[in-house]
Curated annotation (Swiss-Prot):
Residues 48-71 are annotated as: Disordered. It is found in: Nucleus. The gene is DLX4. InterPro entries: Distal-less_Homeobox_TF, Distal-less_N, HD, Homeodomain-like_sf, HTH_motif. The lineage of its organism: Eukaryota, Metazoa, Chordata, Craniata, Vertebrata. It comes from the Eukaryota. The keyword Phosphoprotein does not apply. Keywords: Developmental protein, DNA-binding, Homeobox, Nucleus. This is Homeobox protein DLX-4. During development, may be important for neurocranium morphogenesis. GO terms for cellular component: nucleus. Disulfide bonds: none annotated.
Length: 131
């Protein structure tokens, strides 16, 4: 029975080797898929978020009407200044702000000015958003 056990050992080795080869390629494939996914993932939350944000929007789509009203309204014969309606950020602006916020929690003045200009927002709006 000696040759038999020897060939059994050899077959086992070949099987183990094959198995390792398979798990190796599967492992590297999984790692590759994972790295691609994690690389793309910073943007996924934004798309989902902006999508949800857009769905919530429609009820409040009359900022134009509010802005068209005069800044000062007469109340009991006294002029009363009307506060500007709350800014509604577009989903694109929100996504860009969030992306920037993930990189740096605090913006220096020039960075803030640049970001505000690129998004068509005021620096104050950007500052408040970052708070």
């Amino acid at each position: 029975g000696l040759p038999h056990s020897a060939s059994y050992g050899k077959a086992l080795n070949a099987y183990q080797y094959q198995y390792h080869g398979m798990s190796g390629s599967a492992g590297s494939y999984a790692a590759k898929a994972y790295s691609e996914y994690s690389y793309g993932s910073p943007y996924h939350p934004h798309h989902q978020y902006s999508g949800a944000y857009n769905r919530v929007q429609p009820p409040s789509t009359q900022p134009e009407k509010e802005v068209a009203e005069p800044e000062v309204r007469m109340v009991n014969g006294k002029p009363k200044k009307i506060r500007k309606p709350r800014t509604i950020y577009s989903s694109f602006q929100v996504a860009a702000l969030q992306r920037r916020f993930q990189k740096t929690q605090y913006l220096a003045l020039p960075e803030r000015a640049e970001l505000a200009a690129s998004l068509g927002l005021t620096q104050t709006q950007v500052k408040i958003w970052f708070q």
